[in-house]
Amino acid sequence: MVDQIRSPSWKSGFPSHQHQQGSYWTQGSTSSYLSTAKTAGVLGDVAEKANKIAPILTTAAVIYEMYQVGKEVKKDYHHGTTRNTIKTVATTATTYASASAAALAGSSIGSAIFPGIGTIFGGIIGGIAGGLFGGHVAETASEQILTHVKYDVTTLTCKECGKDYDWKKYEEAQGVCSCQLQIVLSNDAATKLCAILAEKIQSPSQTSNYAFNSYLCYYYLHIFACLNKILNHK
């Protein structure tokens, strides 16, 4: 007959353990099940204490996570977007063990920041990334998912070159095509060089002779003319 054994001396106890050799107390026994039973009792005691302190640890973790999310909320406020906040919520959520836990954490944190949109995207993205990647590449996974669904990314057509380009509202205050960006960078560099060259021409080195200064002036003026063409290029 299969009986159940349980030691009354263990405060936390352990789940009823079945033994096939008869009913007896585990204390003083040489049964092979004894070590397992004692281990179960110790783990039960530890687990009981852990359950009591878990809410405190969870609260501390959520406070820290809310701080991390809060920094992104400020960034999003200036850009008129929610991308950075949602990404942080998803990244934070994926540090949990499973997809369900990540989804729950993501939706909970998201609800506290953005009721509705935060709940939906925090939960879904947290669950997907948590289930697929765990917490190892959480940030990369969240970014890839958000980019894939083009969250807060608008496709515009450039008036200059006619090509489509993506406006990342969460990174830029105003979308700029790559062709315009190159011109802006060229103009900025050319302006700085022109200022340097103009200063050189107006203040030639006192130690240089007249012929050398004349050559430098001619050389600088030639470069200055080329840079002006770049500045006036449309």
Swiss-Prot record:
This is Uncharacterized protein C06E1.11. PANTHER family: CHANNEL_COLICIN DOMAIN-CONTAINING PROTEIN, MOTILE SPERM PROTEIN. Residues 1-23 are annotated as: Disordered. It comes from Caenorhabditis elegans.
